[in-house]
Amino acid sequence: LALHRSRQTKECHDTHDTTTEAPGDDPAAVGARMLNAEDNRLLTGVGPDTPMGRMLRGYWHPVLRSARLEADGAPVRVGLLGQKFVAFRVTHGEVGFVDEACPHRCTSLALARNEDNGLRCIFHGWKIDVTGRVVDVPTEPRACRAAFAESVPRPRYHVRESGGIVWVCLQQGQPPAFPDFEFHALPESQRETRIAVMHCNWVQAMESVLDSAHLGLLHQGQLQRAPADASMADHVRTVFGNTQQDTAPQLEVEPQGYGFREGALRQLPDGRRYVQIREFVAPYYSLLPAAPTVARRFIVASVPIDDEWTAQWFIHFSLDGPLTPELLAERWQHAPENPDNFYENPGDIGNLWGQDREAMRNGHFSGFPGRHIFHEDFIVQEAMGPI
């Protein structure tokens, strides 16, 4: 992905160098740099037997907010990389993560009883502990139950809780190093997480976050209210205003060991240049630009559920104090309150996601007034088709 984006822009080896070359406008050269159908299939296929799927299984993935799991509570279904799982918190508080299908007859363990530090299937009573090991098979003769249970093959996945999130690595054997983001060390009052589930592949979702050019176009309706909106923080108002001044930013990419650093350079009317810098951390994390004077950070992670569905995580945290109710109200204005899917019931292509043509005639660019700014992104991503 970093290579693909660097082909589209001039690689910037000196981030302080303000002289850049304009990309060529030869249509054949531009076409040669574009993603083709074969590359697209390679990137979007995330199942266990695909190249991308095998690569992604070597990473830790956020799968649930920790708050969703209660000790001895209902298991929660989780889709990740084209497979189906259930997560559960056992009696003593530890989190388990296992294949959804019971190893006996493949019925869903989302229906299982969660008790006595394990899941017990309601069909034949087989019990699976927090590590995924089968520990009881009451349908077998007592004399051989223990040996039979031990013989049942069952993959075991790596699970860790940190930063209010349940993380999972599907790789068998030794897991990789855990991602050391700043928010892991912060108290709950200084961080919050919300998730949006959308019907498009993870690459479409991820590239939208990295794409600075659309800010002054798709989000015009949001930007137009910025100068007069007293509830909007000064640095946010500045960002919105500057992105409208130049809708064709020049992109510069600097490869890094963790991914790449991307700069979007805009020319302002007074001769200054406005630069937004994003960090991309493999395999799908985008660290959004932040004002130098603000100690708040925003990470977006585009986690593949399968080839056609994505759970996009929005991790917001403050390094210098609690996230106040007022700040969160501003950040999530017009967003549904469900933190586990603030994009629920959005509509679809059948009703054009509720687009308001009257609002468009009255000057709203996208036709989605009263919607959270991220909803505009989700809608155009879904409108591309799932792949």
PLM ranges: what are they?
Residues 2-14:
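Short, Lys/Arg-enriched N-terminal segments with co-localized hydrophobic residues
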Residues 3-5, 37, 45, 253, ...:
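Generic detector of low-complexity/intrinsically disordered segments
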Residues 11-29, 48, 94, 167, ...:
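C-terminal catalytic domain of Rieske-type non-heme iron oxygenases
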Residues 13, 17-22, 64-191, 250, ...:
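Rieske [2Fe-2S] iron-sulfur-binding domain
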Residues 21-84:
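Zn-dependent metallo-beta-lactamase
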Residues 32-45, 53-54, 77-78, 86, ...:
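Short low-complexity stretches enriched in small and charged residues
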Residues 57, 153, 160-162, 296, ...:
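A short, structural micro-pattern
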Residues 59-61, 81-83, 155, 258, ...:
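Short beta-strand or tight-loop elements
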